[in-house]
UniProtKB/Swiss-Prot annotation:
InterPro entries: Ribosom_uL1_bac-type (IPR005878), Ribosomal_uL1 (IPR002143), Ribosomal_uL1-like (IPR023674), Ribosomal_uL1/biogenesis (IPR028364), Ribosomal_uL1_3-a/b-sand (IPR016095). This is Large ribosomal subunit protein uL1. It comes from Bartonella bacilliformis (strain ATCC 35685 / KC583 / Herrer 020/F12,63). Gene3D superfamilies: 3.30.190.20, 3.40.50.790. One of its GO terms (molecular function) is tRNA binding. The lineage of its organism: Bacteria, Pseudomonadati, Pseudomonadota, Alphaproteobacteria, Hyphomicrobiales. SUPFAM superfamilies: Ribosomal protein L1.
Amino acid sequence: MVKIVKRIKKIREGINFNELYTLTDAVSMVKERAVAKFDETIEISMNLGVDPRHADQMVRGVAHLPNGTGKNIRVAVFARGDKAEEAKAAGADIVGAEDLFETVNGGTINFDRCIATPDMMPLVGRLGKVLGPRSLMPNPKVGTVTTDIAGAVKASKGGAVEFRVEKAGIVHAGVGKASFGAEQLIENIKTFVSAVIKAKPQGAKSEYIKRVAVSSTMGIGIKVDLVTIRSE
């Protein structure tokens, strides 16, 4: 307990929690404080001026991070025939149809992204109660229901990050690892923020982005000045 308190105190040192830091400074501070024995994930959290209980204020999309996430993404694909072979050739970890349905329906989910061809959706749709709560249900709006299976698999493996606003109006995602260079993280963060801005719904309030913060897995949030994300 004493060690934990000391670690938290050390992480908080030098941070003014009332200040908005430039993106460059915030990334530097987060990296300096990511001292765990594993490669911590660098995360972004955005408070949005939306109420997702209203359909016209839902925020959902996908950001294609130029430098990847640093995570080995396991991809499952629901497809048959040539499309199943296309998925395997593109590097999908799990490919199947009715057999994969039975596996998932039985509670075995050992993948991070789920892709399906349009003809498979009547079957996959029956897995809504299993995949939905885990944000794994394929959706054409984020490119996971598609005939371009190879492209979708490669995008998922290469840094595609899905996002969806939560009940409190918060969007968050991992945008890299502490081992990434500062410029790599900055590029990824800018790309993610741009994707969220592009996903602004018609019903959003005038102040769409209220707060942006970055942190590491074991660290604390450092608030970022949105202007510097757009200008640096």
